[in-house]
């Protein structure tokens, strides 16, 4: 929806933007035009009559220029060709496994049969 504003000050533009953003269903609001005097409102289920009345009451005199449905761009589905599958080869290692090393610890004092405290 494109709304023509008759505003001369930045304060009125800000107020008009605030009123438009507060409306139900509005998803985006932008100022366009040579003199930043057109308010572009995009949304789902926006009531244009109530928005125009709210803008006239709270901001300034406005007129509705265009009201149109925003159409989503059509995306052409391209046929997807499957890519050739590349076989993954397993990793082969020529390295020999390392032998396990065990360390044997001997008690130099021998088995104790009693109290060692003297």
Curated annotation (Swiss-Prot):
- Return the InterPro entries for the record: HIPP47/16 (IPR042885), HMA_dom (IPR006121)
Propeptide per record: which residue ranges? 116-118
Record keywords, A-Z: Lipoprotein, Metal-binding, Methylation, Prenylation
Q: Can the keyword Metal-binding be found in this entry's annotation?
A: yes
Q: Which residues form the HMA domain?
A: 1-67
Task: Locate the transmembrane regions by residue number.
Answer: none
**Highest taxon of the source?**
Eukaryota
Q: Where is the lipid attached (S-farnesyl cysteine)?
A: 115
Q: Which GO terms describe its molecular function?
A: metal ion binding
Q: Which Gene3D superfamilies match?
A: 3.30.70.100
Residues annotated as carrying Cysteine methyl ester in the record are 115
Q: Which family does it belong to?
A: Belongs to the HIPP family.
PANTHER family per the UniProt record, alphabetical: HEAVY METAL-ASSOCIATED ISOPRENYLATED PLANT PROTEIN 47
Q: What does this protein do?
A: Heavy-metal-binding protein.
This chain belongs to the protein called Heavy metal-associated isoprenylated plant protein 47
Species of origin reads Arabidopsis thaliana
The lineage, from the top, is: Eukaryota, Viridiplantae, Streptophyta, Embryophyta, Tracheophyta
